[in-house]
Amino acid sequence: MLIRFGLHLDGLDPTPPSTVLGEVTLGPQGLIGVLETNLGLPPVLDHPAERLMAYRSCLDEANDLTRFYHRSFQVDPINVAGTLLDWRARWYEAGWTGTFPSDGTDVAPRLRDMADVEILAKDRVPLTIGQRLQRIAADLGSRRTQIQKVILLDDPAELPAAWRAVLDQFEVEVAPGVSPTPNAAPGTDLHTIQTVLADLAARPEGRQLDKTRLNADGSFFVLRAVSRDISARAIAETLRDTADPAATVVIAEADGIILDNAFERSAVPRCGFQHYSRFRAVSQVLKLCLALLWEPINPHVLLQFLIHPLGPVPSPIRRALAEAVASEPGIGGRAWRTAIEDLDIHHLSNQAKDLDIHQIRRDIGYWFESARFPVDAAPLEILTERAQRCANWLAARLNTATDPGEQAMFRAAYAQAEALMNALKGLADQGQDHIAKIELDRLLDEVTRVQSDPNTFAEAGRVRATSHPGTIAQAVSQVIWWDLPAHPAELSYPWSQAELAELSRNGVELPSIGAQLERRSRLWRRPILNARQRFILVVHDSDQGYHPLWTQLTSVFENWAEVRLDEALLSGSCEVLPHLDVTTVGVAVQPLPTPKRWWELPVELAFEARDLESYSSLSKLFFHPHEWALTYVARLRTGRSEDLPDGPLLYGSLAHRLFENFFTYHDSEHDSERGSEHASGKPSGKSSWRDLHATDVREWLDEHLPTLIAQEAALLLEPGRGIDRQQVSATLERALVQLLEHLRAAGIQRVRTEYREEQAYLDINIRGAIDLLLTDATGQEIVVDAKWGGERYRGEEIEANRHLQLATYAYMRKTATGANRWPYAAYFIITSGNLLAPDDSVFPDAVVHPQAVDEDIADLWSRGESTYRWRREQLDAGHIEVNVAETEPTARSTAPQDALENDRGPDRFDDFTRLTGWNSFS
């Protein structure tokens, strides 16, 4: 058997295809597998997490106050184990035997500790590459293999010691392209570059002061680009009509999947670049399942679990719960409870007829409402059980999957869940019964390592490809190095010079940093030196800097053939891209649409009146009709992952629910048929709010507010939000105390909260929830709307008689009661505790904003009705006004004299600005 071996050949192989029997190209894993099979040695098939946890147990057993890793291990044992496991693997591959001399020679403390741990690890931790090579080298002395010769694609002197010990026992021939001489035709730019680079490599102490000027003949060609997708498409078009695919090698060190996707779009066979990721949907399920166990609940993680494409809870259920969380971030609030109550067979019949509603409720209880634990300690038993439940779900999905790619994904995810369970059971076997969140997260990172995409594969007739430049060890007609990425300019060891010297004295042959840098440079130069006819280098502009090879080329050479791809395409001046022979097709520039003040629809497509409106929808219809159309007719909305309310919106919602719960709890006279039927569930009538003092309010808040925050405003429980939570809590306490003072001063006898009302309005109905519906001693009703902030703006509304929201609520109550007079209306500002009113006739301590116009709330409502008719006439005719920036009102924008003034500017909270056109500043 003839083996072609290279340290970087476990991935794609750029060597020409061969039909010779008994000849194979292998990388490290492949060669070790062949040798172990030939020698009858058992393979090492452990999961990486198994090795990690085994070594962690050794570190734990050897740990005491004197160990160098002691303090770090207490904080993050998984990360420490991973780091030291890497040290161990590198040492073994460099020739370590697992010990240091015990003849009284002083050993550095860290090396001594590593040797002490190794006494345990040798028998417990699965073998490293270096240990397997040492085992193979020992057996080769007494056993034979089928390998007759090894053609080495690396410099033998640069191989790690363990590899040299194995290869020294075979006939080895070094491939000619390992130390290449210039291969291009003399007189070409490529030959000049090869000659100069070879000369510089031969005398590294020398330095070329003057740049070598090239002739730009295209034999060495640089393609500059910003977009990787566009450059990949250009390379794909270049290769589409190539007569001999085997004459070209493509290098893509990273993101080769972009190149393969471009090949597929251009009908070029895929090379088989792999796309490795730990973020595939199925791989995230295990992490999300376990992330829900920590206290406090993380609403962002909860929403991710619910909107994730996959999960152990049926998708219709997750979607319904996601809606609840998006409105009230938390678990157990009103929206959450309502969503669960709505989960019945009739609700699900159209989407999931086979779902068992009782099992669904049990699953909801298990996954979302189980006990949660502090981040410093969760029971291993609970975590193992949850991982097992996740594994059972993955196994069920695997058994029903029919697509091979999907099966591979679920199989890999199931293996990850099994690996986690084994790791957790291993910790339990060591006597540990709890694990901290940071340690579990590290462990999850290990078991859910990057996963390849089973749907990426090489196709027949492809060009040769590789992900490492060092694998090109023979002359090639054309080399294309796509995406020369930034690399760290410096390398370093985590060990001191004294420790390195001691390791060297004990047979651990670690190359110097200088030797590593020189070897890296030689590997980078190898593709250029092995190119015979043309070398194409694709360089992308990046904020991360440039590849050291690019830095060297730009410092030594000038005037090569170069095209800036993005500029060439955007200018439209190149019908054929120079040196690539790629024909470009001109595309007319399509400017982005600019904002228009009016959208025009055919009359037959005009919007009919909706049966039901609210103040919110009417406000959009009156002042920003395009928002009304897109929100309520087109039903567009922002994505749920971006839709968790926060800031004043969240705090205001929390305050509304708090007021509702408070008055329901403390007043037996609340309306049991309307606004308060969904209150906290606490028995009312404990004591009247009229008799409460500030200390009573504080005690009630101390008991009830933390639960409410966890249920409906859990964002305030996230790390870093402690100050926000304290400020919001203090604001709510102050506001509630001051609200009670206002109510007592006004002689309020009855308080109804979140009072739902629906009444006829012109030819439709109007619906709303009144924050506070009050009744004083005379029987007069007062509607109060609570706002988190905006005191100045709300005061100006009252002064100008533009408080349309209060007018809406007052109209509904006037209509419902048949009263002759309109209810009194006021705003309560939560952040200041002030009550804003047009006079102090009801609330003696109100901040008075006398109306500056000779109109009252009835006149305001009449103007609103005229505005509604005006806007409906426009919509019926297909006219939709778009009140956005960079548009000016037209004559059609002027409202009738008896309507509300249409003087509002663009809505700064408009969700649809990108759908209404692009202005010059976009």
Region annotations inferred by a language model:
Residues 292-295, 308, 482-490, 529-533, ...:
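Short, well-ordered loop/turn and helix-capping segments at boundaries between secondary-structure elements
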Residues 155-158, 227, 252-257, 275-276, ...:
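An acidic- and aromatic-residue-enriched active-site/binding cleft used to recognize and process polar
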